[in-house]
């Protein structure tokens, strides 16, 4: 399958022997599980029941944004009479059971994880999602024993595109940022990973096809296009 290399990526991106692949950090929604359409559908459903139709463009903009920020935006659209705590509780009550019931690995995930594990490359997860949502997905996919660390947006002060959640994931991975590759599917996520000093691969999905991935070292349409050797080549070579 074809891939697009982006000139804005780091030196050696997509070519050469590369340096040492020290770890891989996955985003969750849209990367390891196709949960973003379900999340946006749930939010739109909640707003509609309260008399507000959310535009597709707004839902598109909210992709990859922390749930706290999503609730702020939706709450503002619904008006002053909305209890933000009740809104969040309603979302959790609807979304988490649906997520547990429908979570399935994205194409290529299981093969990529098996290859990384076989090569001894540590893996972690950095997501704007809550710990409850992360637990629902990692439990459904059986990733609990695979990931060395998990970092949630609710554990940091600043959400993506700030680097905080990636810096926390790198810390829990047990490595410095050098040699670590992040896999993202949103412009905010790519910006966060790059700001944390990581090389980033962008997965262009149906939900994020219009996002600006100019900071990514590589753009693919599926995890099926990635393997250990390809990720290794993205790591800048030692000078």
For every predicted segment, state its role:
Residues 41-84, 107:
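Alpha-helical substrate-recognition element adjacent to the catalytic core
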Residues 1-22, 114-117, 130-239:
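Asp-based, Mg2+/Mn2+-dependent phosphohydrolase catalytic module
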Residues 2-60:
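Active-site neighborhood of HAD-like aspartate-dependent phosphohydrolases
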Residues 39, 63-67, 87-95, 130, ...:
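Hydrophobic/aromatic residues within well-ordered alpha-helical segments
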Residues 38, 62-66, 104-108, 129, ...:
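Short beta->alpha linker loops
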Residues 53, 74-111, 119:
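Metal-dependent phosphoesterase signature
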């Amino acid at each position: 399958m074809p891939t697009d290399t982006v000139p804005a990526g780091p030196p050696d991106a997509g070519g050469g022997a590369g340096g040492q692949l020290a770890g891989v950090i996955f985003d969750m929604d849209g990367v390891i599980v196709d949960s973003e359409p379900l999340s946006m559908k749930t939010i739109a459903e909640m707003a509609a029941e309260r008399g507000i139709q959310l535009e597709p463009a707004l839902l598109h903009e909210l992709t990859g944004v922390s749930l706290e920020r999503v609730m702020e935006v939706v709450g503002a659209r619904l008006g002053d009479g909305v209890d933000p705590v009740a809104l969040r509780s309603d979302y959790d009550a609807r979304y988490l059971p649906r997520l547990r019931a429908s979570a399935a690995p994205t194409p290529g995930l299981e093969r990529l994880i098996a290859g990384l594990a076989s090569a001894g490359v540590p893996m972690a997860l950095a997501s704007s999602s809550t710990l409850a949502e992360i637990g629902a997905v990692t439990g459904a996919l059986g990733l609990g024993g695979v990931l060395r660390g998990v970092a949630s947006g609710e554990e940091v002060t600043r959400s993506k595109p700030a680097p905080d959640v990636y810096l926390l994931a790198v810390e829990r991975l047990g490595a410095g940022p050098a040699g670590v590759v992040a896999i993202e599917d949103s412009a905010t996520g790519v910006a966060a990973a790059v700001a944390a000093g990581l090389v980033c691969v962008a997965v262009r999905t149906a939900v994020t096809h219009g996002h600006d991935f100019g900071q990514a070292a590589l753009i693919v349409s599926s995890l099926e296009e990635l393997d250990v050797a390809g990720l290794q080549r993205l790591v800048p070579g030692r000078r």
